[in-house]
Amino acid sequence: MVNVKVEFLGGLDAIFKKQRVHKLTLKKNNSDDEPVTVGDLIDYIVENMIEDKNDVEVFLQNGTVRAGILTLINDTDWELEGEKEYELEDGDIISFTSTLHGG
């Protein structure tokens, strides 16, 4: 089990009931011992936090975070941390920031 803070910034909060910050407690397969990964977090977000399933494509594309969304793990680009394979730790802050803006 792991406690993390998840932030949706740059307008992404619009698909999450306009709430920018969420505190989550996650378990993998109802096990307290198995590590929870960022991939598990993304699955949880898609399955439980996006109300309108038509909005999933705003966040996800081809099974991963959509291009144009900067993903940070504790202020470090997730590509440097192993992307979806990163094992979450208590107190981690995962930020998703849309860099795409209409105009």
UniProtKB/Swiss-Prot annotation:
The keyword tRNA processing applies. GO terms for molecular function: protein homodimerization activity; protein tag activity; sulfur carrier activity. One of its GO terms (cellular component) is cytosol. It holds the Pfam family Urm1. SUPFAM superfamilies: MoaD/ThiS. The modification 1-thioglycine is found at residue 103. Pathway: tRNA modification; 5-methoxycarbonylmethyl-2-thiouridine-tRNA biosynthesis. The keyword Cytoplasm applies. CDD domains: Ubl_Urm1 (cd01764). C-terminal thiocarboxylation occurs in 2 steps, it is first acyl-adenylated (-COAMP) via the hesA/moeB/thiF part of UBA4, then thiocarboxylated (-COSH) via the rhodanese domain of UBA4. Disulfide bonds: none annotated. It is found in: Cytoplasm. There is a cross-link at residue 103 (Glycyl lysine isopeptide (Gly-Lys) (interchain with K-? in acceptor proteins)). One of its GO terms (biological process) is invasive growth in response to glucose limitation. Keywords: Cytoplasm, Isopeptide bond, tRNA processing, Ubl conjugation pathway. Belongs to the URM1 family. Acts as a sulfur carrier required for 2-thiolation of mcm(5)S(2)U at tRNA wobble positions of cytosolic tRNA(Lys), tRNA(Glu) and tRNA(Gln). Serves as sulfur donor in tRNA 2-thiolation reaction by being thiocarboxylated (-COSH) at its C-terminus by the MOCS3 homolog UBA4. The sulfur is then transferred to tRNA to form 2-thiolation of mcm(5)S(2)U. Prior mcm(5) tRNA modification by the elongator complex is required for 2-thiolation. Also acts as a ubiquitin-like protein (UBL) that is covalently conjugated via an isopeptide bond to lysine residues of target proteins such as AHP1. HAMAP family: Urm1 (MF_03048). This is Ubiquitin-related modifier 1. It comes from Vanderwaltozyma polyspora (strain ATCC 22028 / DSM 70294 / BCRC 21397 / CBS 2163 / NBRC 10782 / NRRL Y-8283 / UCD 57-17).
